[in-house]
Design a protein with these regions (language model features):
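Glycine/tryptophan-enriched, flexible segments
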Residues: 192, 200-203, 211
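Acidic/polar-rich alpha-helix caps and helix-coil junctions
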Residues: 1-175, 179-184, 205, 209-477
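Active-site core of glycosidic bond-cleaving carbohydrate-active enzymes
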Residues: 183-194
Length: 477
């Protein structure tokens, strides 16, 4: 017998159940059914066949339900950040959302969507009772490494870092090299993502050049307003994307208008510059100076309240007859982002959407709200979107920016001074920009065009595991 109290022992066991569920779900969403090990094995019992996917999901869900009945609503002191009942319920909702999605639910069984809806609604309601909710600002969970941000009411489950024993590289890795040290330039946005963001009023991206109320889509190669694709966008754009000429907002900028130029020949050497023409600024703490950029400990958020809301909205849209609930959630997300309500108070959303339009609206909002949080790839897999005709032969696109003939003789320093003269921000946001720069669109990776069929949505088991366990069968496909 040990010295732990029964209460402490049960809470440790509940956390272990959560972690086992989390790891099993990571396997199941990749491979489908996997060997389900629920007790200590001896060597003779180590070869176990794959279990059915349905059995694995059932075990994961049951374990999370059990954990949620034991875990507290929060932890204090040095235990702050441990797994809570809200985290268990939120993960349960995510698991059932995946299981209801097309990758696992080829016949679109409505009962699975109802179960996913019920689980996510229960998670939302419990989280609200426990004090969770949206932060007042979009970047409130990562704007700095204070407990006020990292343990804010929106954070449900995260990987915690603590300098100097356990440092995080995200703040260093996302920045351009001239603002960081070592390997940088992570999370470089593709043109497709950049063009996807809605406008500041939540409407579809584009510009009404003729004033007739009809928008023309942005065209990065145009030299009129259609080419100013960074102007007037969703506020989340500017907390995620950095385009040529924007100020990268850091405390140790040498001067107020120190801009990030990404044109060819104007940046750091090409081997270390952006491969897409863009940088990301999400997860950046502006007050961290270049010399300290790797001495940092920003937590990595895995589940936040906004995702739970979007999980619920997607399930509500699929279940049907819950349109007001879907609209309420989408408006709440957009209002917090800073999008204007407009006269109809729909924050740019189309009125009276069909069921499919609502589903598409939720998936779109997930793409924008959760950008660079590790969700989009899995959304596309579980929805089997890689097989959609629009992605057949798809290859990622980038922009290449060059100086115009009138400015091509300017050095980077002279260009920066010339651009700043008279107001760099006004030049950046007007057609005066095209006196300095011209843009072309190119493919990033023609060698890797998408061609995914319905048998490619579960990964093959690694050969070494098949060799180590004769009872394992390879994934079909």
């Amino acid at each position: 017998t040990g010295t732990l109290s029964e209460d402490v022992r049960k809470k440790i066991e509940a956390q272990a159940l959560f972690l086992r569920s989390y790891r099993y779900f990571e396997l199941v969403k990749r491979y489908g059914g996997v060997p389900l090990i629920l007790s200590v094995q001896d060597r003779k019992e180590s070869e176990v066949p794959r279990e059915k996917t349905s059995v694995c999901i059932s075990q994961i869900v049951n374990d999370l339900s059990t954990a949620a009945t034991v875990l507290p609503k929060s932890w204090s002191g040095s235990d702050a950040g441990r797994i809570t009942r809200g985290a268990a319920l939120a993960l349960k909702g995510r698991v059932l959302l995946f299981y209801a999605s097309k990758q696992f639910n080829r016949n679109n069984d409505a009962a699975r969507w109802q179960a996913a809806y019920d689980a996510n609604l229960a998670a939302k309601e419990q989280l609200e009772k426990d004090g969770y909710g949206l932060n007042s600002t979009y970047d409130g969970t990562w704007k700095d490494n204070s407990d006020a941000s990292e343990l804010s009411k929106e954070v449900i489950f995260s990987k915690r870092y603590s300098y100097p024993a356990n440092k995080s590289d995200i703040n260093a890795g996302v920045r351009p090299l001239d603002y960081s040290q070592g390997a940088t330039g992570w999370n470089q946005p593709t043109l497709d993502l950049v063009l996807a963001y809605p406008m500041a009023d939540g409407t579809v991206p584009g510009v009404d050049i003729d004033g007739d109320g009809v928008k023309e889509p942005f065209d990065p190669t145009a030299t009129d307003e259609r080419g100013l694709f960074w102007v007037g966008r969703d506020p989340r754009f500017y907390k995620t994307i950095v385009t040529n000429g924007m100020v990268y907002p850091l405390a140790d900028n040498q001067y107020p208008e120190q801009r990030q130029f990404t044109y060819k020949g104007g940046e750091i050497e090409i081997a270390n510059s952006t491969k897409t023409g863009f940088y990301s600024c999400k997860f950046i703490n502006p007050v961290v100076k270049k010399v300290d950029v790797r001495n940092y400990d920003l937590d990595l958020v895995e589940i936040r309240y906004a995702e739970v809301l979007l999980n619920l909205a997607e399930c509500a849209a699929e279940v049907g007859n819950k349109d007001p609930e879907v609209y309420t959630i989408l408006k709440e997300i957009r209002k917090r982002a800073g999008i204007t309500a407009n006269a109809d108070e729909l924050y740019g959303l189309k009125a009276n959407m069909t069921k499919q339009e609502l589903i598409d609206a939720v998936l779109f909002e997930r793409r924008i709200e959760l950008a660079y949080e590790g969700k989009r790839f899995w959304d596309m897999r579980r929805r089997m979107m890689f097989s959609d005709p629009e992605y057949k032969g798809y290859a990622r696109e980038r922009i290449e920016i060059e100086l115009t003939d009138a400015k091509k003789e300017l050095s980077l320093n002279d260009l920066a001074k010339d651009f700043a003269n008279g107001g760099g921000e006004s030049k950046l946001n007007s057609v005066d920009y095209f006196k300095y720069f011209k843009t072309i669109v190119t493919k990033i990776d023609n060698k890797f065009q998408w061609d995914v069929d319905d048998n490619h949505y579960f990964f093959a088991l690694p050969k070494k595991h098949l060799e180590q366990n004769a009872k394992l069968e390879q994934t079909k496909g």
